[in-house]
Amino acid sequence: MYLESSAKPANKKQPASHKASSKESIRHVVCFKFKEDADPTAIRKVEREFTALKAKIPGIRSLEWGKNNSPEGLNKGFTHCFIVTFQNDKARTVYLPHPDHKAFVSILKPILDDVFVIDFNP
């Protein structure tokens, strides 16, 4: 997910030990908190459009998602989680500015309250 944000990254520069190798797969975890007045039909469209990216953007090895069902109550309003597995760092680099990804973001933004993204190597 690549969204412009006014929030400052907590740690923009990562230690070398945390940088992805060009051959390692990357997990891209994206959690959404929708606006309280978001139309359920618009949320379903976001679900469909995000999952459709797997067929549109090369280098996505897998994509899975689900809605929060934790009984702990610690989700802070985040309801949807998507996990995209990229073949490697190059695939993620292609994904972020890809026109289909940007089109998805334009569908998402009007109903999005907050987003949380973390990438890691499994």
Ranges and model annotations:
Residues 1-79, 87-94, 120-122:
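Short S/T/G/P-rich N-terminal loop/turn motif that feeds into the first structured element of a domain
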